[in-house]
A protein has these predicted regions:
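N-terminal flexible segment immediately upstream of the FAD-binding catalytic core
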Residues: 1-70, 87-117, 262-267, 272, ...
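C-terminal substrate-recognition/cap domain of FAD-linked oxidoreductases
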Residues: 24-25, 29-42, 237-404, 408, ...
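A glycine- and small-aliphatic-rich helix-loop capping segment at beta-alpha/alpha-beta transitions
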Residues: 91-107, 135-139, 161-174, 213-220, ...
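FAD-binding subdomain of flavoenzyme oxidoreductases
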Residues: 108-112, 119-255, 451
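Activity-critical C-terminal alpha-helical subdomain
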Residues: 422-488
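Ferredoxin-type iron-sulfur electron-transfer modules in oxidoreductases and energy-metabolism complexes
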Residues: 478-505, 521-608, 692, 696, ...
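Iron-sulfur-cluster electron-transfer modules
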Residues: 502-505, 535-728, 734, 749, ...
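Cofactor-cradling patches in redox/metallo enzymes
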Residues: 572, 644-737, 772-789, 794-901
Length: 1024
């Protein structure tokens, strides 16, 4: 591996001593901070050189920023300010030995003035999040970038440019900023008024780190969009000029070229669990998209119609207009068929736009997608994207066409839209007199040039190369024009990664839309935990620069499977399904292990068909005795309660069955023959166990004559609805079951008047949308319809609900580690419950309820969590016990099991077994171990034992297992059913787990083993 410049031990220690500062020096993590969303070809990338930072810091307040700046000045360490890294100009690319200052925790609203219509925010707040919060107060931003789902307020000001949605009415972003607070390179804090913003606007953090910004706002009003189809660029120009001449009060005006429409039509459709979703076919013409305030729509429409007609254009169908308006934040969709893009972004006069497009078509032969945004009535920004493949050498040639577009824009009075590391030679034309202002300021305040070096001056060799390419552009263009992109997905496996995963990794736009909604990233806060970071890591694996180990495998396993990323990805990449593929590739293949607790669950599922280490014979004990005679031996409808509702939260199963009975639904039930649905094994990567479970359940349902399976658990519903059919098709198993959730059945009965709640439940309730039935299934309204039908219930909504609902934070995340991240994610969810003023949170998922109850207890939050079916049963006059105490009791056991199964604690457990292991060794080895008493030979034994232990353990484990079980029983107070099963479950768990962890355990146990040989004494051991 190439040398990476590190911080000195002294400077690193001092940095770590800054109280509250989050620091990451993990090399793998640092690699993920080497770039922004821009993608350079191999040749100019060499000129940029190494870009691995020495550390990443995440300050959480101004004081920490000031302390880091003082530290950087003391040790002459460059600082690279970074927010969302959603630009492509190289503005956040580090230099060797630098520290990236990531401002993701500066994401709050500081003050909102509804009278003056202003808001002061921290720089790391994401535009879409800000707009969401402002809308709740009756306000809205004046404008936002096309990257609003990920980009930040501070990033837009620092990068410059500032053209986006709303620019037609309000101009550039800087013109809508009232003030900004900045920490300068000497550590001073200054506040810049609007007239002084030139010091930081467009300076890319070279003159200071923005810590707050005050924006001017507008009153909230919905926008009405209009779509127009034009055949020629001349028509586009005429329409836009007439709109200006006639004074149409537009908020936004923009368009795409015919190539953009054609390529968008070629992009694979968005899929939902493998099923393609419909999308309209765009006319392969110039498509104009205009928007105005809703109150002005009638007037605008009246004036617009003759303009469109006189230009020879036509209005777009409403469905296409609405689709494109909803899709307006997704300009990079065509990267899906690239999988790379050659970008060029220029600003040109409107009155030359027809000439620019006519010449572009003549000049650049590969397809060029253009998304245009009007800055005002006089200028327009053109985002030009040429699809290609960065893995190919010819990408270097194709990239030169971006210079052809730049030169073309200049010919017609335009310029580059922005500068940065990659276009530093354009800085004087883009920023004009500001360059000298910035350089003078830096000479005074940043003599060491520590704040984001190279972003103003650029890289001399790169500037020379680009200058030469511009000088010889006609010749260079000839070579670039010979390149023909393939414009389709092409899946090829690479370095052990499946072909589709490799393609998606390169397709990823690195825009960060997924990062902003990722539950895991929201809890952890480092790039490697985000989908964007995972795609970047997979690219490195494909290129042979990284190899999967257990730590990174765990990173993929920890995904909460909430699917929020799938709903926000602008390329419609199947992100969560791809992580599911990787779980199989990593775990089911045997290369890595799943989380240890899941091995215990797998052993339990294999033996007793459930994940709770309980006995199958107890599975149906939840059934109310008066209902037993009503449950049919055979029926076309079956109720499938699942493991958690059967063994832990039994009120869910009992209430669900009573609701079905009250609704007149005749059903059968597998009873003791029911197995876990298998989804825990599927998401844990134990596909072998999942397949066995699936085959069992399908066979048993067929034996009972079932055609429709009704589930109460969303995960069980998802399994029967989606995963079983997919796997059955793959395995050639006949599958003709329909899957429903009980809320669908009951809401239908209520709507038809076939069922009615009779008893009031006087509570203000809010409903939690479970991911596995909400985003994964689109079932949002039936549960709400049930609650609304109960007398006395007042239903209130949380800030995030339905498709945007927050995950409870469970699934593998809770099982993955002691002091789990799930408690933090659960707190985030419960804070929303408290904020909406509800008396309790209602959920329909057993696992969500379990997670929220445990999180409430861990965070000291007195927020009741109620089951939907139990609340509904109360509406029928049926009272059921609250199982929260039993939930906490069971979690206390599993929490200790999870803690015990961590490698350091497993090593401690093994240490306690050293005397028995020594006795169990073959006689020759026992004799050899005694050599450790000989001076000097103990060091030899210390080297020998770690590689020997994995070889010896298969011999030793059966002999020491009884002792291990006794030690575990001493440490963990288990319920009787679990204690009785441990002699069967623990050996199987160890069999699957130890081969992966023994090398680490051996290193930790060896010193204690040598000590025991010498002294017959063990070190003091404490786990709990």
């Amino acid at each position: 591996m190439a040398h990476v410049k590190e911080l000195s031990a002294e400077s690193l220690l001092e940095l770590k001593n800054i109280e509250g500062l989050r620091i990451n020096t993990d090399l793998r993590e640092r690699h993920l901070y080497e770039s922004d969303m821009g993608e350079l070809p191999s040749m100019p990338k060499r000129l940029v050189g190494k870009t691995t930072p020495a550390a990443i810091v995440q300050p959480q307040n101004e004081n920490e920023v000031i302390q880091v700046v003082a530290w950087a000045n003391k040790y002459s360490v460059p600082i690279i300010p970074r927010a969302a890294a959603s630009s492509g100009y190289g503005g956040v690319v580090p230099v060797p030995g630098s520290v990236v200052m990531e401002l993701v925790h500066f994401n709050k609203i500081i003050h909102m003035d509804t009278d003056k219509k202003t808001v002061t925010v921290e720089p790391g707040i994401v535009w879409k999040d800000l707009e969401f919060k402002l809308n709740a107060a009756g306000l809205a931003v004046r404008m936002m970038p096309t990257s609003a789902p990920a980009s930040t307020v501070g990033g837009w000001l620092a990068q410059g440019g500032g053209a986006g949605f709303g620019s037609y009415q309000y101009g550039l972003f800087e013109q809508n900023v009232e003030s900004a607070t900045v920490i300068t390179p000497d550590g001073s804090k200054i506040t810049l008024a609007a007239k002084d913003l030139s010091l930081v606007s467009g300076a890319m953090g070279t003159t200071g780190i923005i810590t707050s910004i005050t924006l001017r706002l507008r009153a909230l009003e919905k926008h009405t969009a209009f779509g127009i189809e034009a055949k020629t660029p001349a028509q586009v120009q005429e329409i836009l000029e007439q709109i200006d001449l006639k004074g149409l009060p537009l908020w936004h005006a923009g368009f795409m070229n015919p190539t953009a429409a054609r390529l968008k039509n070629r992009v694979p459709p968005k899929t939902h669990h493998g099923h393609p979703l419909p999308k309209p076919v765009l006319p392969e013409s110039y498509i104009l998209l205009l928007a105005c305030d809703e109150s002005r729509a009638a007037s605008v429409e009246k004036k617009l119609a003759p303009i469109v007609k006189d230009a020879g254009a036509v209005m777009l169908p409403q469905d296409i207009t609405e689709h494109e308006w909803e899709d307006r934040f997704n300009p990079m969709k065509i990267k899906r068929i690239g999988p790379s893009l050659v970008p060029a972004e220029v600003i040109v006069p409107l009155n030359r736009i027809a000439e620019v497009f006519e010449q572009m078509e003549e000049t650049v032969k590969p397809p060029v997608l253009v998304e245009a945004t009007m800055v005002s009535s006089k200028h327009i920004v053109l985002l030009c994207l040429i699809p290609h493949d960065a893995r190919k050498l010819t990408f270097n040639l194709a990239f030169t066409l971006s210079l052809s577009i730049l030169k073309l824009a200049k010919r017609y009075g335009g310029r580059a839209y922005a500068s940065g590391l990659y276009l530093a030679q354009e800085a004087n034309q883009v920023h004009r007199t500001r360059i000298s202002q910035w350089l003078n300021f830096k000479r005074e305040k940043d003599a060491k040039n520590l704040f984001n070096p190279r972003k103003l001056s650029g890289i001399p060799l790169m500037k020379m190369m680009i200058g030469t390419a511009l000088a010889f552009e006609p010749m260079v263009r000839i070579m670039g024009n010979r390149i023909k992109p393939q414009l389709r997905e092409n899946w090829k496996a690479k370095n052990g990664l499946p072909g589709d995963v490799v393609w998606y990794a390169y397709s990823c736009a690195r825009c960060g839309y997924c990062r902003n909604v990722c539950e895991l990233y929201g809890g952890k806060g480092w790039e490697s935990t985000s989908p964007r970071g995972k795609w970047a890591y997979l690219r490195r694996v494909a290129e042979g620069r990284e190899k999967f180990d257990q730590e990174m495998t765990n990173n993929f396993l920890k995904c909460t499977t909430c699917e929020r990323c799938d709903f926000t990805c602008q390329l419609d990449l199947p992100i969560e399904p791809s992580w599911a593929v990787m779980r199989g590739e990593l775990v089911n293949s045997g290369k890595q292990m799943t989380f240890p607790a899941f091995e215990l669950m797998a052993a339990s599922a294999g033996k007793e068909k459930n994940i709770w280490a309980n006995f199958a014979e107890k599975r149906d004990e939840w059934v109310p005795e008066d209902l037993r005679p009503k449950i049919k031996d055979k029926a076309e409808i079956a109720y499938f309660p699942g493991c958690t509702a059967s063994f832990v939260e039994k009120d869910i199963a009992a209430a669900s069955a009573r609701l079905l009975d009250a609704a007149g639904v005749e059903f059968t039930y597998l009873g003791k023959d029911e197995a876990c649905c298998g989804i825990p094994m599927l998401v844990a990567g134990r596909w072998d166990v999942f397949e066995k479970i699936m085959r069992h359940n399908i066979r048993k349902m067929k034996e009972h004559g079932v055609k429709t399976v009704i589930a109460s658990c969303p995960a069980c519903w998802l399994t029967w609805h989606t995963y079983y059919p997919q796997w059955a098709k793959k395995l050639g198993i006949e599958y003709d079951f329909e899957a429903k959730h009980y809320s669908e059945v009951i809401s239908e009965k209520l709507a038809r008047g076939e069922m009615k709640f009779t008893h009031p439940v006087n509570m203000k309730l809010t409903f939690h949308d479970s991911c596995h039935i909400g985003r994964a299934g689109g079932i949002y309204e039936p549960p709400r319809d049930m609650l609304k039908a109960i007398p006395g219930v007042e239903l209130v909504e949380m800030e995030h609900n339905r498709e945007n609902g927050l995950c409870c934070g469970s699934v593998l995340t809770r099982i993955s580690e002691p002091d789990p991240l799930s408690n933090k994610l659960g707190r985030m969810k419960l804070e929303e419950v408290a904020a909406c003023g509800a008396d309790a949170c209602v959920a329909l998922c057993p696992c969500c309820q379990f997670q929220m109850r445990v999180s409430a207890d861990a965070n000291g939050m007195d927020i009741p969590v109620k089951d939907l079916a139990a609340v509904a049963a109360k509406g029928l006059g049926i009272e059921l016990p609250d199982y929260t105490p039993y939930v906490l009791e069971m979690w206390a056991v599993f929490d200790k099991v999870i803690t015990l199964m961590q490698v350091p604690n497993m090593a401690k457990l093994m240490t306690l077994l050293i005397p028995r292991m020594m006795d169990a060794l073959p006689a020759p080895l026992r004799g050899m171990m005694k050599m450790a008493k000989v001076p000097g030979l103990d060091r030899m034994m210390a080297r020998m034992m770690p590689p020997m232990m994995p070889l010896l353990m298969p011999i030793l484990m059966p002999k020491v297992m009884p002792d291990m079980l006794r030690e575990v029983e001493k440490m963990i107070e288990m319920p009787d059913f679990m204690k009785k099963q441990m002699p069967d479950l623990m050996p199987k768990t160890m069999e699957n787990m130890l081969p992966h962890v023994l090398p680490e355990i051996a290193v930790l146990v060896t010193p204690a083993m040598i000590q025991y040989v010498k002294t017959k004494q063990l070190p003091s051991i404490r786990i709990f």
